[in-house]
């Protein structure tokens, strides 16, 4: 093989392994959140998946973003804040690897902003008032956009339509209250978050399963 051919093959090897690492990090981030969010729920006295917001696990306020009449239940708050922080941090690192393998700047920017917003939700729980409210809005908005743009890093795969669908649904239900009457505010938020997590798992699973060329010596 010529020197130029070896160089191209080596670049492809590094690129594909960056995508694999990014995909693994996406999957790990989501699974650890699934597990520890459930643990936080079980330790929260009288928690209702339909009546309570997910962020209530970090701090519960009667009328958010007002910081009046807020209560923090430990250890559920500490567990929840930690798993949200880890979710954002691991996703942010994973997005860096995905960018290294794709060089798609629109996806990088939107995904990185969303990941950073997730991280900040873990730093600023519900009892921080408008700070929490603002980063939550940024989270849902940019995560929906990033899932839409994920089609640019899924080459020739039908799975790209799934990420687009998750992105569209995330943005649509972020600005509507369609299911709130049937499932409560907690159920409504969970449906929104679930679309995001499933979108990330779909993308992460795709990237993890990519075939890599053999390394070049």
Predicted feature residues:
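Short, Lys/Arg-rich, polar N-terminal cytosolic tail immediately upstream
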Residues: 1-17
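Hydrophobic cores of alpha-helical transmembrane segments in multi-pass inner/ER membrane proteins
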Residues: 2-3, 86-93, 141-149, 194-209
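N-terminal signal-anchor transmembrane alpha helix
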Residues: 17-46
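Membrane-interfacial loop-to-transmembrane alpha-helix junctions, especially the N-terminal start
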Residues: 22, 26, 103-111, 156-166
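Extracytosolic (periplasmic/ER-lumenal) interhelical loops and adjacent juxtamembrane/interface segments
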Residues: 46-76
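Individual transmembrane alpha-helix segments
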Residues: 65-98
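Membrane-proximal helix-loop-helix units in multi-pass membrane proteins
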Residues: 108-151
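Terminal transmembrane helical module of multi-pass membrane proteins
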Residues: 150-217
